[in-house]
């Protein structure tokens, strides 16, 4: 591998996110429906390094070059396989930090998949997903990068049917950052009756947890605690619904909010208004 290899690393939204329990080892068990998105995206430019190990550089401040999801993924793979190729990685960030889009998790999955593709003795998908779960709950999903249900601590992945063809998904990324660690801490500290408030978006109930139901009540366990500290995110969600969205929900631990529109023209109108307020907005035709 003498030439640079550019790995494209996308993001995700959670169309349903239940934090079901906190385990004794500190990990949280989840039950979530994931949808991969191509935009926004990061790029990892990989070249051969000078010595076994990995060196990561990034122009964005706040990313520790020695301890990040990419280095953790490399270390986990090397420990499990004994394969330690010399790599240099330039991380070009396009996914907003603290937005609940899983940018760091996608970076980890990208390097795991890359190592698996060049290793003389690949570990196999099952082992790779177990390694991924140790890095973060979203990482196993990005190993697959298809619409799926994730349970356990994120390592149990089940691909699902997707009935929203023809909808437009609008993703809004305000100038707000929410720490995932803070959100989990706030969730743990909240009383059960305070945090189990449903993020009501459409009508009906989730009859089949292995599919995305058009009549589902989309839910995010983080919304009550995050909205309490960042009421502007609640206002953003309400604004999307006023623009005719069939559904709107915060993704992950925030701060991004997405909406599903049946009518493309409603999505276009919301897109233009949010752009006018300085919010990063992305459109996806599903």
UniProtKB/Swiss-Prot annotation:
Active site: residue positions: 12, 138
Name the Pfam families for this protein.
GHMP_kinases_C, GHMP_kinases_N
Q: Which GO terms describe its biological process?
A: isopentenyl diphosphate biosynthetic process, methylerythritol 4-phosphate pathway; terpenoid biosynthetic process
What's an example of a GO molecular-function annotation for this chain?
A: 4-(cytidine 5'-diphospho)-2-C-methyl-D-erythritol kinase activity
Catalysed reactions, semicolon-separated: 4-CDP-2-C-methyl-D-erythritol + ATP = 4-CDP-2-C-methyl-D-erythritol 2-phosphate + ADP + H(+)
Pathway given for this chain reads: Isoprenoid biosynthesis; isopentenyl diphosphate biosynthesis via DXP pathway; isopentenyl diphosphate from 1-deoxy-D-xylulose 5-phosphate: step 3/6
- EC numbers listed for it are 2.7.1.148
- Keyword terms, alphabetized: ATP-binding, Isoprene biosynthesis, Kinase, Nucleotide-binding, Transferase
Q: Write down the top EC class of this protein.
A: transferase
InterPro entries linked to this entry: GHMP_kinase_C_dom (IPR013750), GHMP_kinase_C_sf (IPR036554), GHMP_kinase_N_dom (IPR006204), IspE (IPR004424), Ribosomal_Su5_D2-typ_SF (IPR020568), Ribsml_uS5_D2-typ_fold_subgr (IPR014721)
Report the SS bond pairs. Answer: none
Q: Where does ATP bind?
A: 96-106
Homology family: Belongs to the GHMP kinase family. IspE subfamily.
This chain's function reads: Catalyzes the phosphorylation of the position 2 hydroxy group of 4-diphosphocytidyl-2C-methyl-D-erythritol.
Any idea what this protein is called?
A: 4-diphosphocytidyl-2-C-methyl-D-erythritol kinase
Please give the organism: Nitratidesulfovibrio vulgaris (strain ATCC 29579 / DSM 644 / CCUG 34227 / NCIMB 8303 / VKM B-1760 / Hildenborough) (Desulfovibrio vulgaris)
Q: Taxonomy-wise, where does this protein's organism fall, top ranks first?
A: Bacteria, Pseudomonadati, Thermodesulfobacteriota, Desulfovibrionia, Desulfovibrionales
